[in-house]
Amino acid sequence: MYKKFVPFAVFLFLFFVSFEMMENPHALDYIGAMKKDTVTVTASKDPLYEELLQKAPEYEVKPQNARIDKVWKSIPGYNGLKVNIEQSYKKMKQHGKFREKDLVYSQVKPSVHLESLQPEPIYKGNPDKPMVAFLINVAWGNEYLEKMLPILQKHQVKATFFLEGNWVRNNVQLAKKIAKDGHEIGNHSYNHPDMSKLTTGRISEQLDKTNEQIEQTIGVKPKWFAPPSGSFRKAVIDIAAEKQMGTVMWTVDTIDWQKPAPSVLQTRVLSKIHNGAMILMHPTDPTAESLEALITQIKDKGYALGTVTELMDETRLLK
C-alpha cells in the first residue's frame, strides 16, 4: 500500500508545482535566472572565460557625444562598443580558445545627441564614421537627373535630394520618381533666393511654402534644409530649427555648375573625400558622366554611401 502511495504523492507534488509555475510567471523568471546564474558560475571557472573578461576592456570603444566644433559647427555623436561577454564566450567555446574574430559587440549610445545641441549648420558627419553622402540640389537639369537616377539605382545608392519648391510644382512626376526610388527629400527653398538677405518673415515663407509643396506632392515632410548657394545667416538656422529641420552644408564641392571635364570633377572629389564627407552636386552633364565612377571609387576606398539622415545616425558601422 505504501509503495503504491509514493508514486501518487510524487505525481501530486509535481502537478501542484507545475500549476504554481503556470499561475505565477515570476516563478518561471526565477528558474530562468537560476539557470543563467548556473551557466555564468560554470563559465567563470573556465580559463577561456577568465581570459575573455581580462581582454574585453582592450576592445571597448567609448561613445562620442555630439558637439559644437569651432570650425565645423554641429558634429553628430557616434556609438561606442562594449564586448558582450556571454555571446562572445558562447562563440569562442565552440573553438576552445580566444579568437578576436569571435568577439560580439553591443553598441553604447552617447549621452549627448545632435538634436539636443543649439541650432548650428551641419557640414559633415562624425569624423570616425566611414560613410559619405551625396547632396543633390535640384532646381533645374531634368535631362541629367534622368541619367543619374538609374545609376544610383544600379549601385543601390540612396542620396539626399534637396528640391526647390517651385521645381516640384512644375515637375510632379519626376519629383515622385526620386522619392519612389527611395531617396531622401530635403528642402531647397521655394525659388532659390539669397536666404541671408531675406527678412525673418520671408525666410519662414520660403521654408513653409516648399515643405507644403513637397508634402502635397510626395507625402513626406523634409527634415533637412539646404540654403541656395550655401548663403545663410543665423536667423535662417534658427527658423529652420523651429520647423524641425537641420541646416545642411557640405565639405566637398563638385563645382559642377562650372561644367568641368568629368576627369577634373572626379579628381576634385576623390582627392578630398574623408569620413563623414557631404558631397555637393547638381544635375549637370559632368556630374551625370562622373557619377558611376565616383560611386565605384568611393566604395573602393572603403566608404559606405548613405543619405544625410543615415550619415547623422549614431549607429557605428561594423566591418
From Swiss-Prot:
One of its GO terms (biological process) is carbohydrate metabolic process. Residues 1-27 form the signal peptide. Residues 130-306 form the NodB homology domain. Disulfide bonds: none annotated. PROSITE patterns: NODB (PS51677). GO terms for molecular function: hydrolase activity, acting on carbon-nitrogen (but not peptide) bonds. Keywords: Hydrolase, Signal. Belongs to the polysaccharide deacetylase family. NCBIfam families: spore_ylxY. This is Uncharacterized protein YlxY.
